[in-house]
Every structure is written in structure tokens, then in C-alpha cells.
Amino acid sequence: MIKNRFILILVIVALTVSLLSFLLAFCTDWLFFVETGFTSVFTTKLYAQAGSGLLFAGVLFAGTLLNLLLAGKAVFPTYATPREAGDFRPRLDEARRLVKPLGIPACAILALLVGQWGAMQWEKLLFFVNRVSVGTTDPVMGRDIGFYLFTLPLMETITAFAGFTLLTSLFLTVLVYTVRGGICLSERGVAIDGTVRRHLAILLLLLSCVIAAGFHLDCFRLLFSSNGIFHGAGYTDVHSRLPTYRILTILAPLAGTALAIGLWKGAWRMALLAPLAVIVLHVIGIRVYPGLLQKFKVAPNELALEAPYIRNNIALTRLGFDLDKIETIPFDVDTQLSSADIARNDATIKNIRLWDHAPLLKTYSQLQQIRTYYRFFDVDNDRYLVNGRYSQVMLSPRELSYADLPSRNWINERLIFTHGNGITFGPVSRISKEGLPEFFVKDIPAVSLADIRVTRPEIYFGELSNEYVIVRTRVPEFSYPTSSGNINTTYAGTGGVPMDSLAKRMLFAARFRTEKILLSSDITSQSSIIFNRNINERVRAVAPFLHFDDDPYMVVDDRGRLKWIIDAYTFSDRLPCSKPIKGGVNYMRNSVKAVVDAYDGTLAFYISDPHDVLIRVYDRMFPGLFRPISAMPDDLRRHVRYPHHFLQLQAAMYTAYHMTDPKVFYNKENLWQVPALGEKPMEPYYTIMKLPGETAEEYILLLPFTPSKRDNLAAWLTARSDGANYGKIRAYTFPRDRLIYGPKQIDARINQDSFISQQLTLWNQRGSEVIRGSLLVIPIEKSLLYVQPLFLAADKAGLPELKRVIVAFGDQVVMEENLEQALQRLFGGKRAPEPASSATAKDSTTSPALLAKEAMAAYEKAISQQRQGNWSGYGEELRRLEQILRRMAQ
């Protein structure tokens, strides 16, 4: 008795703790949605989860309990005789005493578990309720694509649930009948009462109908199969498995009926023959015959028989990853680029990205981190109108790193150090005389060296803001350091949940497991707690059904406020005949741009692709969550860009799926690949350039292709980002009858250049680390430039400095101190001003005599450096001598 009470107490305590945990999460989450203004999203999801969970739980509870009650009311004669049956017959009285009181609790526990599972099916339920027609039908079954996206998942769930409910009811019913004596085990076999047989017959008949429904759904699931060559239903599936599933759909309930009749009448042969026939047909029609058909008919004539199904796979994969909108344009390369062409494309030249993300991040960290507790997490690429010029820039937010605080305690981490401060912002191609980046915005407080102003530099919401903070307390917040002392601030934004009651303080003290929130005298009724500050967590909390890009980027709006833009994707694994990527996804769209204010955490979700069928359904599911892209402020819309990761994914699929002819696809005649330097494939890169046939420069994302297992260029893919052209993708294809150098071939030519190789060797011997930047392919007019920056660092922890720029064109490769000098050397024309650090910066009208003296001085200094063993200095003087001689030759 005491033991039973102890168990009961443990159960009650466990249930109470679970309930309190649920209520705690529920209440604090509700307050978060109140803060963000998306309570309708919270309630819609809550009602859907509750309704779905209760529906599944209620059906299972009613179904199992009904069968248990029917089994419990049946009366059977007592099998009291023979002792010989004692080894097999249960002790009925003891078993009844145990089983009878457990019936309802067992059904309730099962219903509770199924209810939790059912609550997770809320999205499928809402998908079905809000489904829309796509307008495109699958080529095999003739169903609208929307059926597979929105209806089939729920049908599969209901079928699986019905099967589980019937099997559970069958098991529990057999158990009760066995205990009550309706099913008696003896040495002579199993004796089943007529009432039991009739009950079990009905259950088995219903189960056969569920199995038939499963066979019917298997017909549609064939469109998600794979035969190794392509995805989707193939010849064998359509001509063997599909007819078999259709026959089984009809035979299964007939076999179930025969089984039920045989069981009802006690005719065991009739009961077993029909199900056995279904099993045999399934094995032959789904396993044996398709294998024979594939081996002896399809394999010898594969292309001829599979061509229509390969065409289906190509069309639907292109639909799934938005490849069908890519415009293919021939690009006939010539090598007649002139200085006049370079001058006409000055905006493109000035926006070639010389600063790589990794070296620039390290340089920013050493030059602009200011204090150890600030950190630059990432560098983002964007474009701005700077001093009237359309410019590509690199921007990095200066966030607060709690791990690097000099004194880590609750007051410092939660009340004082609450936010990061400002940004570092500069051009992608300009270099100071020391080989360092130039800045448009820098320092704390922000200093603007251009017409970009940051008026609200505080960053309360960012990529490193992983912990809660409490603002408007009695403790001043740290804003930024100065030479004369620290500057403090008080939060003036709308973010956070007001701590205006004891109940809220208790709730958040429990959620964050600290009594300090409850006991601290620094917290007043005017204070607010800000949580879910990590921008990725914040947007996922509101829209967990979207996949968010892991590379958010910050922009400065016209008012000088800092905003985060995060690309969001809709996705599905339910597009028939489409090749899936890792994780099973075979449909994906970049349909949403999420915006988060870095100061007050305000959220907005804008639909950037209204043609996406999934976002149309989500918009119906959650009215008020999404806004049209036309509602986005112009100062933010100017910074919307085509996402790097999405184009990378599309490019990976496009390497094969640019081939639309089934024969070419089958033979892989024109298979492409993304070129690689070393082991890592090239990634798409942003640049500003004038596309062929266009009249103005624009911000694009670019990635080259090479033929499979070859190094020459095959094409380049570009995604546009500006204005009405946003989202338009073009593939420029090169002639296949001549060689166009690819990145790997250019890289090899750079390595083979004697002067460049010698210079790299000299730097390495000196102990410097040479960092070779990304090799960029830049289309200019109908030609291609290849540009690679070189960085030097004293050691692996040293400050990277951009010391040289390598440019290749046609058969020429040059290395100069900056891009302008390299282009002038290749194409001539007006010489660009040289940096102040150049030791040879002289007036172009210097007399030959003076140039000769300068050349002799450089030569003598080079010899002196050689004798001293200073090979780096020797190389520098040779470079200086070369430049003087070139000036003399002009």
C-alpha cells in the first residue's frame, strides 16, 4: 500500500512539473509574441496544434475504448475442466483483477502520446485547409502539383494513424478476450468464441481497407522513387509497379472481406487463402517482375524507354529549384579589349572586389575592434550610393562578445554591457598606402568619411546576442569608451517585455533560472527584459516553418538606423519527379526577406517571390504575418540582394539540369562543374558590372562553370539584384569550339610566371605569410579579366596587408601594386595615379637623364641588398627598377 502511494506521488509530482514547465514556456512565449506584435501567429499555431492533437487523441481514445468495452461486456463459458490445459490457460481471476482497472488508463496514456504526435501534424492540417492549385499537373498520374504538396502528406498521416489505431485496438481486444476466456489456449490449439471471431473479423476488415488505402497512396509515392539515373517514376515503375498497386488497392479489401467471412464462420482455409494471395501478388508484382523487366527489357533499351521519364525529371527538377526561369545567352569571347573599353567600364573596374572576406575580417578586427569585448563576426557585401557614386562596399557590425568581457558577472552581462556599437564600412577595392583598407565609416563613436551617416549605432540584436539583457534599470548601460572615460546610455527603444509586475519577474526568473531577476533592487517597474536577441533565433521563433539563411547582412537606412536583412526560404520534399538535395528537399524558393531592427528588434517579413505556391499558402495560414515587397521602404529595398547560398545551390543543380534534351542528359554530353582551386569549389561572388546588352552597371552575383573534369570555361551564371530586375538569372555560355581559360588554368599560369614565382618565394623566405585571395573572373565587354589580390602578413596572427594585385588577360599575366597599375600595364592608356607609398612616384614628364640616374640608383641599391642577404629588399628594388625602365620606354 505504501509503495503504491509512493508511486502515485511520484506520478503526480512528475505531471505537475511537466505542467508548470509548459505553462512557463507558454506564458513567456506569449509575452514575446505580444512584444513583436505577432500574437495572431502564436494563436493560429496554438489552435492548430491543440485541434490536431485533440482530434487524433480523441479518435484513438474512442476507438480503443469502444473495442475494450465491447470485449469487456462479452460473457463466455468457464473452461474449468481439464488439468491438462493448465499449462496454457491463464489464471483468469488474477488476470482480470489486473487488466480490468487498467483499460481506461491504458487508453488515456496511448491517447496522450498520440495527441503529442498529432499536435506536431498541425502544419499538414493547415496546409490541407489552405491548399491552393498550382496549375501544373504531374506527367504520370495527372494530378495537380498542389495535391502532392498539400493533400498527400495529410492523407499519408491519416492512413498511418488509422493503421496504428486499428492494430492497437486489435492487440488490446485480443488481450482482453484472452484474459476473459474468449480466446483459450490449450494443447489442442486455440479455441475462439463466436462473439470474439465476429469482433475480430470486423477489425480485420477495417484494417484491410486501411492497407488498400496505403496501396493507393503507393501509386503516388512512385513519383518520388529513384533508379540511379534520374528521380521519379521510370518505365518499370509505370508498367509494372503502378498496375500492381492499383490491383492491390482493389484486392486488399476483397481479401479482407474473405478473411472476415472465414473468421466469422470459422472457415480458416478461406480466411487465410485470400490474404496469402495478396502477399504473393505483392512480392511478384513489386519485387520479382519489376526486376526481370528492368534487366531484360529496360536495361538493353534504356535510353529509348526511359527518355519520356527523364524528360519529366528534367522539367520538374528545373521547376523545383527555379531553374526554368534561367535565360541562356551565347557569349562570344574576344581578346580585343582596349584601354577605351576599360575607360567605358570604369564603374565595373572600380568595384572589383580586392578585399577577401577572411583577410578583411582579420584586418577589421585588429584596426577597428577598439576594445577586447567587441568582435566583428562577419563581413557583409552590399552596394550603396556613396558621394554620388554607385559603389560596392564591405560592412561589418561591431558586436559585443560576452565571452571577452574583462569582468564577467550578472550585473555586467545583463545590466551594463547590453549592446554592441557601430559598424566598419568601406569600399571593396581601395587600398591605403600601407596596404590597408580605406573606410567610409569607422571608429566609436562613428566617424563618417562619406555621406553615409549612422545615427543609431547601438546593436541590441545581432548574430552574437545570445543572452537576455534588462534595460532601463537603476544601473547605467555602457555605451562606448573614450580617452576621458566611459560614456553611458539608457535604452530608448520599444523592444523588450516590461517588468511591471511581480508575476512577470517570477516568470522570467524561472525561465532563465536565476533568482537575481526577482531579487535585484536595480530592476524597477520601468525596466524591460529583452530576450530572443539573436536575430536568427528571433525570426525562427516567429516563423519556424521557414528556413533562414545563415548569412544575415546589415544595412544602414536613410535615417542612419542599422537593420538586418535575412533571406528566408520555403521548401518541400513533396515535388514529384524532382531530384532532391541533401535532406530530401526537392522544392525551394527564396520567397521572404526578413528585416530586424538592430536597436529595438522590430520584425517585418516581406514576400519577395509572390509566385511561390508555398508562400501563398503560408500567407493564407497566417494572415498579417507577411507583407508584399512593395511595402518595404525604398531605403531597404535598394539593399535587397539575391542570396549567395541559394545561387550556389541552384548552380550545383544547373551543372546537370541545364541539359534539357533527354539524350544529352542521359549521356552527360555537356555536364558542367563549379571550378575549384585546390579542394574547395569556387563560391558565387557579388560585383557591380554592366551585363552584355545592358546600358548601366548593376549589382549582380556571379559564378563561372567549367565542363566536367576539364578546366576551361563553359559558362558563367549571374543573378541580378537591382530594382525590377531582381531575381532574374542569366547563363552566358561560351563557344565550345575554342579554349577559354578557366580559373584553374589561370592559377597555373600565375604559378608558372617566373617573376611572380620569384617574388612569392622572396616573401616566403623572409618569413611573411603570403595569402592569395579569391581569383575572380570579371566579364568586360566581350572579354574576360582575371583578378587575384595578394595579401602579406608577418605571421599567421599578423595583420594582412594587400600588397599586390595580379591581373590576367588573354595570354598575359601581370602583378602590380594596385589594380590601376596592372590595367595600365596591360592596356596602356592614361596612367592612374600611383599610391603615396610608391618609391617611384615621379612626374610623368621627368627627363630621360633624371630617369636614368634614378634607374642606376635603384640598381645599385638592389646589388647592396643582395650582398646583405636581404632578398625581400632586393626584390623590391628590382620591381622599382622595372617601373623606372617602363617609364623611360614611354
Curated annotation (Swiss-Prot):
<dbReference type="InterPro" id="IPR005372">
    <property type="entry name" value="UPF0182"/>
</dbReference>
<keyword id="KW-0472">Membrane</keyword>
<keyword id="KW-1003">Cell membrane</keyword>
<feature type="transmembrane region" description="Helical">
    <location>
        <begin position="266"/>
        <end position="286"/>
    </location>
</feature>
<feature type="transmembrane region" description="Helical">
    <location>
        <begin position="6"/>
        <end position="26"/>
    </location>
</feature>
<protein>
    <recommendedName>
        <fullName>UPF0182 protein Ppro_2689</fullName>
    </recommendedName>
</protein>
<comment type="similarity">
    <text>Belongs to the UPF0182 family.</text>
</comment>
<feature type="transmembrane region" description="Helical">
    <location>
        <begin position="200"/>
        <end position="220"/>
    </location>
</feature>
<feature type="transmembrane region" description="Helical">
    <location>
        <begin position="244"/>
        <end position="264"/>
    </location>
</feature>
<dbReference type="Pfam" id="PF03699">
    <property type="entry name" value="UPF0182"/>
</dbReference>
<keyword id="KW-0812">Transmembrane</keyword>
<feature type="transmembrane region" description="Helical">
    <location>
        <begin position="50"/>
        <end position="70"/>
    </location>
</feature>
<keyword id="KW-1133">Transmembrane helix</keyword>
<feature type="transmembrane region" description="Helical">
    <location>
        <begin position="102"/>
        <end position="122"/>
    </location>
</feature>
<feature type="transmembrane region" description="Helical">
    <location>
        <begin position="157"/>
        <end position="177"/>
    </location>
</feature>
<dbReference type="GO" id="GO:0005886">
    <property type="term" value="C:plasma membrane"/>
</dbReference>
<dbReference type="GO" id="GO:0005576">
    <property type="term" value="C:extracellular region"/>
</dbReference>
